[in-house]
Amino acid sequence: MLHHIFQKVLLPAALAGTMLAGTSAPAVSLAAQAATQPDSYHDDWLHVNDNAEIVDKDGNPVWITGCNWFGYNVGSQVFDGVWSQNMHDMLRQIADHGFNFLRIPMSTEILLQWKNGDPDPATPKVNQYTNPELTEEGIEGGTIKYSFDIWNMAVKWCRELGIKIMIDIHSAETASAGHQVSLWYTDKFSTEDWCDALAWFADYYKDDDTILAIDLKNEPHGTADVKDQMAKWDDSTDPTNWKYAAETCAARVLEKNPELLIMVEGTEVYPKEGYDWTAPRIDYTTMTEYYYGTWWGGNFRGAKKYPIDLGKYQSQLVYSPHDYGPLVWEQKWF
């Protein structure tokens, strides 16, 4: 089977005090294991060992080949593209191309909708003629199912195809441009709402190892130009402190399911030596820059001094820097 690079680079962190680099000896393919028959033993949970390797229950390093499929975060109430293609066929294509891990962007809003059993704000964007399985009657042109029921059909099909799932909170509110919002909370949905949503999700699927991981928040970012919207990383309990928020939310999630991998992305900026988070972004008189900058979610300078601490669940932590190749923007390291 072809080995592909996971789109989001995974750097496991097995020790609370150390940022660890991933190793290069993955050995066991999840897809190959699951392809023979649907898993019914719920024993595919993953962990991180002291060598910063993601391993299975027997300590064997695993090879994760991932892709993303969005839609649930933007208001479609389903994967985008199901308005014209058959969802089951699309999932088969993902598996047939050798992918064994599917990262699915979500919003806090849609998880809370499902948690509370609220009706869909809009009919899921499903073509009921190409997706008769997603209708109440099971016929072409039928009544489209509730979005959570459709989601659970996707989970079932992924389980049968040997595809594992990681959701990420792409934004608090469901919106096509929600990823532009720098933090994990807004005026509409609080940090507590975010934690409640993910804790509910972890509890709901705690007996189903199709759901292997949660990426707590896509691309925390922001600069000192708007300080109350800047994700920072330090030892404070400030509402904008990403480290504190991530540890708090992870504790809620792992209380419900201690087997889940917890992905923690970085921030956008970090203060340079001699400065702190009160500094302006730049002094235009001297053109002095006070922060190290990088991609949204790609800055882990804070983790060196203030590593994420998940306590007894440290073996579930994966630092997940968000990085892009030169086709997006040429960088000096390419």
Predicted regions mapped to residue ranges:
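Bacterial N-terminal signal peptides
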Residues: P12-G22
